[in-house]
């Protein structure tokens, strides 16, 4: 029921996985919102508790994504209606996916999960999948450039000016070199839910209302918008998710003055993929606090554990997540809530 608090009914669809473990009819004690899709392994429908689960599903009729496994053929004869059918891209080759997509098309919308490379993504779509899910886009696919492009370099200059508390007129002069930067910055601030009583109209207005520290975190997002990579929107969404998740996970564990730095650490964690430039080169051009640089370079420091937990959340490894969360003293409920809040936050942003 906590899902409704952070992902209100009527918002974008969200998939909720039951994981590989078995589940039973008690799952339906939860009244899933209409925009929530429950991911369910086919084996659950023919397990010892399968008949009770089937009866509950037919009574409540939640939106389902049935994950195809060796028991799927039998599970599909149970009468349970599925909107989606999920296929693990690691288990099937291209020919198998084509055959399965054709055979199950009338039973549900085909989605490929655990897609590991851009080539695998293209293959899944060519095989007849309607959509594909994976984190393949977070890894740079080409050799890094030797330097930042002019647009990226100007954003770094603005960031350095804000971090050093430069005069507003000096920062405004830098912003005027690329009007799109000011536009994007104001759009981010006005859609980010600061709870402001008025719309921010200019950089000077933003400084007066928010202060340099808060502005610094939103300026950090502009580096990603300078990317021309077709995967940039997905990368930006993921960077925002990591940024907000790290901030939420650290709540009560670090001083509040460090929240913005944790946000920036997450936001910058995909700069190499977004900018096509090695992370070392980007950091050399910026004046970042040492804990941020250390975490991004994998050198440890007090932000490293929060970044590692954010990265673990993108892997289908419950044990790894549990171990990382336990190291920080976080319960499963705390982690799950922070994860959904971060996802909702990233989804609300406009790129």
Predicted regions and their residues:
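Conserved alpha-helical "signature site"
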Residues: 1, 6, 95-351
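The catalytic core of metal-dependent phosphodiesterases that act on cyclic dinucleotides
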Residues: 30-138, 258-261
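Bacterial c-di-GMP phosphodiesterase EAL domain
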Residues: 1-56, 210-211, 234, 252
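Short, solvent-exposed coil/turn linker segments
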Residues: 19, 24, 32, 41-42, ...
